[in-house]
């Protein structure tokens, strides 16, 4: 058997902007942050529409299906402020996400805006 050399690392200096999808990308799925957010989205729909839990949940999933995101449905149908929605539904317990200094350093070392 011959030993293979590591793959060549391409320069990333041409990248000017980075966008990171946080959900299960920069933290492990086991943190289960989405379940907290999902419950808060349902609560938000309940507040905006004055519906009970089951009806709000059904509407939430319908907006997701019909508009691509629940937020888009709420904006189109209820004139919801997206900043208020995002701040509200992301006010969760982040303690399941453990510190990962190597990841922080790797992202900091990337060129461009993050």
Task: Write out the residue ranges for each language-model feature.
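A general structural signal for well-ordered secondary-structure junctions
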Residues: 95, 113-114
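A charged helix-plus-loop insertion that forms the helical arch/lid used to bind
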Residues: 2-3
């Amino acid at each position: 058997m011959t030993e293979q050399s590591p793959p060549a690392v391409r320069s990333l200096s041409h990248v000017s902007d980075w966008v990171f999808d946080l959900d299960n990308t920069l933290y492990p799925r086991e943190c289960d942050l989405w379940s907290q957010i999902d419950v808060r989205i349902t609560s938000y729909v309940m507040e905006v529409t004055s519906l009970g839990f089951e009806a709000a949940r059904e509407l939430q999933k319908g907006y997701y299906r019909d508009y691509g995101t629940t937020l888009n449905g709420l904006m189109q149908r209820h004139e919801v402020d997206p900043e208020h929605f995002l701040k509200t539904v992301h006010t969760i317990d982040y303690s399941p996400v453990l510190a990962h200094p190597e990841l922080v350093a790797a992202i900091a070392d990337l060129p461009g805006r993050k």
